[in-house]
Curated annotation (Swiss-Prot):
<dbReference type="GO" id="GO:0008595">
    <property type="term" value="P:anterior/posterior axis specification, embryo"/>
</dbReference>
<dbReference type="GO" id="GO:0035115">
    <property type="term" value="P:embryonic forelimb morphogenesis"/>
</dbReference>
<dbReference type="GO" id="GO:0045892">
    <property type="term" value="P:negative regulation of DNA-templated transcription"/>
</dbReference>
<dbReference type="InterPro" id="IPR018186">
    <property type="entry name" value="TF_T-box_CS"/>
</dbReference>
<dbReference type="GO" id="GO:0030539">
    <property type="term" value="P:male genitalia development"/>
</dbReference>
<dbReference type="Pfam" id="PF12598">
    <property type="entry name" value="TBX2-3_TAD"/>
</dbReference>
<dbReference type="GO" id="GO:0000981">
    <property type="term" value="F:DNA-binding transcription factor activity, RNA polymerase II-specific"/>
</dbReference>
<dbReference type="GO" id="GO:0042733">
    <property type="term" value="P:embryonic digit morphogenesis"/>
</dbReference>
<protein>
    <recommendedName>
        <fullName>T-box transcription factor TBX3</fullName>
    </recommendedName>
</protein>
<keyword id="KW-0539">Nucleus</keyword>
<dbReference type="Pfam" id="PF00907">
    <property type="entry name" value="T-box"/>
</dbReference>
<feature type="region of interest" description="Disordered">
    <location>
        <begin position="359"/>
        <end position="414"/>
    </location>
</feature>
<dbReference type="InterPro" id="IPR036960">
    <property type="entry name" value="T-box_sf"/>
</dbReference>
<dbReference type="GO" id="GO:0005634">
    <property type="term" value="C:nucleus"/>
</dbReference>
<keyword id="KW-0805">Transcription regulation</keyword>
<dbReference type="GO" id="GO:0045787">
    <property type="term" value="P:positive regulation of cell cycle"/>
</dbReference>
<dbReference type="GO" id="GO:0001501">
    <property type="term" value="P:skeletal system development"/>
</dbReference>
Amino acid sequence: MNIPMRDPVIPGTSMAYHPFLPHRAPDFAMSAVLGHQPPFFPALALPPNGAAALSLPGALAKPIMDQLVGAAETAIPFSSLGQQAAAHLRPLKTLEPEEEVEDDPKVHLEAKELWEQFHKRGTEMVITKSGRRMFPPFKVRCTGLDKKAKYILLMDIVAADDCRYKFHNSRWMVAGKADPEMPKRMYIHPDSPATGEQWMSKVVTFHKLKLTNNISDKHGFTILNSMHKYQPRFHIVRANDILKLPYSTFRTYVFPETEFIAVTAYQNDKITQLKIDNNPFAKGFRDTGNGRREKRKQLTLQSMRVYDERQKKENPTSDESSNEQTAFKCFAQSSCPAVPAVGTSSFKDLCPGEVDRDXDSXDDXXLEXSEWGKISTTTXTHPWXQPAXGRQRVTTXGTKGAAVPKATSSPXTR
């Protein structure tokens, strides 16, 4: 049974959301909410001096709206933000009065049982320089929204504590104090804003959110530190316009079972197996666990054996030639398979082994293709094939017309 979880960020609180009090907020920039988010709101980013003025100590440990109220209470002078930031300030009185809306949002985590399985073993999420999607993906279902009101749905990932971890003796343990925080970003669902009726009619999924350890990332990915524990948070904002975010009602929901440790490669074999068993893109690692290349090689050898047997039945007089050339072709194809893997771009979002080498995978495919090209062009003129072709010409009394069909019927020249 899915039930909404309360936010454990504030000890002792019994509320699952944190409403914003608009009458306490004077004018301030939208960047107080979103921080550094050039991929999502390039025009709303503050200059360096403005960003520094709005940074609050310990802000990441507070709910979103506590950060907003804290920024408002600092009473930052309008002129200190510079001309660029001042251009994006909107007085509260210029906003349209919000219509009376009655709602009682409740959020249910999808695939709760799967998340709990991972949580019991210590969930790990791989982070890479090029960005990696989460598995299980973060999906929720919302109820209790006003059907006509518009909402913006957001997600962010914050540090769960101030510790660094290591995997030792088959368990996670504290290894020291946490590294300095990475720049924080909020991921706004691409369908925002939408009416409550639209949100409630479907599962809200954040499967496109990507995790990275590249501090210079410019794609809007969530930047995390490896070997640190993190907690995803989900936010519901009632607003018809993104520019009204600072003055809108925020509700924050936290599901403890979605907590995870960021890693560059999976540490716990049990987590690796869970991901293989439940991720639809992990078919190549099931059963034997040998990976795609080994499976391709086995399929190639099996198909060549069938082909060889069929050729023996059709051409009994050229058994010797077929055996020699087929043996070489089997060896060439098994060592250099040329069949590309299906679904490689999607599959690399999961597995820690060969797919973690994002740049190497493309090079490997090109290398396989080039090597196979060389082998296939030399097979027809390989020294093993030449004596057999010579013997065939002798048995046909030297007639050119008979020698050509014999050569073209061998597996090496097809």
